[in-house]
Amino acid sequence: MKAISRVLIAMISALAAAVAGLFVSAGTSHAGLDNELSLVDGQDRTLTVQQWDTFLNGVFPLDRNRLTREWFHSGRAKYIVAGPGADEFEGTLELGYQIGFPWSLGVGINFSYTTPNILIDDGDITGPPFGLESVITPNLFPGVSISADLGNGPGIQEVATFSVDVSGPAGGVAVSNAHGTVTGAAGGVLLRPFARLIASTGDSVTTYGEPWNMN
């Protein structure tokens, strides 16, 4: 009986440890700061761009075509400018993908989003020309979408899916469940999300995330 009790206790302890590990893993996966990169530009400002909470949810394609990959993208991109003249910074914040595909005949990518799926984060809209007291996200009709022909594979292509004008020393953009598809790709498709900050002076810095497999 003592031997059986020891076995049962060992099994329960192992199961509890496995469950605890599962909860820890699920709680930290794709949450928080994913990646960042900094650059000192020509005006001695430090430009930093970051990706946060990136999640690409690959789903079974609605057209049931074996050559189609479909996903929904959620996440945030932030930028920070430090140094002389940071308050006067102006530029563009871009989000997009590097897309890798092993074989294809004319791959095409489609990506779309509508407000309130996209939101300016930490943007200053209290001064001219807005003079508002809170952040608003007006509707875009019928929405915004991009479509691009990636050509024949194999290959790696980079596509900027959307961009926003930014100003000031810090800010960001958030996107929730933006819809994307790749058509005409045989085999697995890898998506590497990126965020890019481009200053009005032409300086730019890009941070790339881990690749996501859209099988």
Swiss-Prot record:
Q: Which Pfam families match?
A: MspA
Question: Which compartment or compartments is the protein found in?
Answer: Cell outer membrane; Secreted, Cell wall
Q: Which Gene Ontology BP terms does the record give?
A: monoatomic ion transport
Entry annotated with the keyword Repeat? no
Q: Summarize what gene deletion causes.
A: Single deletion is viable, and shows no effects on glucose uptake. A double mspA-mspC deletion takes up less of the antibiotic cephaloridine, glucose, serine and phosphate than the single mspA deletion and grows slower than wt or single mspA deletion. A triple mspA-mspC-mspD deletion grows even slower and has reduced Fe(3+) transport compared to wild-type.
A cellular component term, taken from the record's GO annotations? cell outer membrane
A GO molecular-function term, please? porin activity
Factors inducing expression: Constitutely expressed.
Q: Which residues form the signal peptide?
A: 1-31
* Keyword list, A-Z: Cell outer membrane, Cell wall, Ion transport, Membrane, Porin, Secreted, Signal, Transmembrane, Transmembrane beta strand, Transport
Q: Could you say which protein family the record assigns here?
A: Belongs to the mycobacterial porin (TC 1.B.24) family.
> How is the subunit organization of this protein annotated in UniProt?
Octamers. Probably forms a goblet with the wide end on the exterior of the outer membrane and a central channel. It is not known if mixed oligomers of MspC with other Msp subunits form in vivo.
| Function description | A constitutively expressed secondary porin, forms a water-filled channel which favors the permeation of cations and less efficiently phosphate. There are about 2400 porins in wild-type, 800 in an mspA deletion and 150 in a double mspA-mspC deletion.
**What name does the UniProt record give this protein?**
Porin MspC
